[in-house]
Amino acid sequence: MRIKARIGVENSLTDVQQALKQQGHEVVTLNSEQDAQGCDCCVVTGQDSNMMGIADASIKGSVITAHGLTTDDICQQVESRT
C-alpha cells in the first residue's frame, strides 16, 4: 500500500494514530517541535494552544486540533487537508 501522507500526531492520541495508520498514512509521534518537521499535517489535543511551538510555522502543513472531535472527524479533516 502506498503511503498517503506523513501525519504528526500528539503522543496521547493513540486511537487517532491507529486509525490514520489503517488508512495508509505514515504516522509520526509528536514528542518535540522537531518531530513535526517534514509532516504534511499535525494533530494535537488542543489542551495547549501552542503545543511545543507547533502552531508557529514549524510545519508546512495544517495543524488540526482534536479537542471536541471524534476519531472519525479527525480522519476526515486529515483526508481533506492532505
From Swiss-Prot:
Domain of life: Bacteria
Pfam families found in the cross-reference section: UPF0180 (PF03698)
InterPro entries listed in its UniProt record: UPF0180
Disulfide-bonded cysteines: none
Transmembrane segments: none
HAMAP family: UPF0180 (MF_00506)
Family note: Belongs to the UPF0180 family.
Protein name: UPF0180 protein BA_1413/GBAA_1413/BAS1304
